[in-house]
Amino acid sequence: MNDAALAPDVSAALERGLQAQSLDTAFAAPLLRYLALLVRWNKTYNLTAVRDPRAMVTRHLLDSLAMQPYIASGMLADLGTGPGLPGIPLAITRPQLQVTLVESNGKKVRFMREALRHLELRNARVAESRAEALDEPTAYDHLTARALDKLAGIIAVGGHLLRPGGSLLAMKGIYPHEEIAALPEGWTMSEVHQLQVPGLDGERHLVVVRKA
């Protein structure tokens, strides 16, 4: 399947969503190529429980891109990225960002490598590893985690990757009061942004945590 095989309403929904997020609709073309590849591989390899391409636009692409106003450049490690979410959409829309996609599942790693080749995406690479085993201490300005763990758990497995003063950007549903209260020593909550994801009901928050 190529992007042309996706139904017209999928492309239209993505373009509307990009406009709502103040992003250039020129990004629709590479995002649709990524989506088409994900749909094709998902039929065989079960990379995501979301099957419908229109739902993928909202729940994967636009949800991932909701954090892009808060991260523009630097070195980013996306922990437990699965098939490349949010890392690949962020790499597409933020060319100044250098993204490392951290994932230990072999089939998801193979998919991401094919996606990067297919998209000719030069500002992203795949690290086939569990986050805690990645031997790149203090190499990153930012960490992201979309559905990995509670804040303390993310820090436990990936905190060593972040430079002092760097930021963890964690996607959450409802405001995570208890998780923020349980942050380990040396980590402080910097900002919490309530996110608006076009077409997605329910609360979404981006929690920004700083490393001392």
UniProtKB/Swiss-Prot annotation:
Function description: Specifically methylates the N7 position of guanine in position 527 of 16S rRNA.
Family assignment from sequence similarity: Belongs to the methyltransferase superfamily. RNA methyltransferase RsmG family.
Residues holding S-adenosyl-L-methionine: G80, L85, A131, E132, R146
InterPro entries reported in the protein's UniProt record: rRNA_ssu_MeTfrase_G (IPR003682), SAM-dependent_MTases_sf (IPR029063)
Subcellular location: Cytoplasm
Organism: Xanthomonas oryzae pv. oryzae (strain MAFF 311018)
Protein's name according to its UniProt entry: Ribosomal RNA small subunit methyltransferase G
Gene Ontology annotations for the cellular component aspect, listed alphabetically: cytosol
Recorded name of the encoding gene: rsmG
Signal peptide as annotated in the record: none
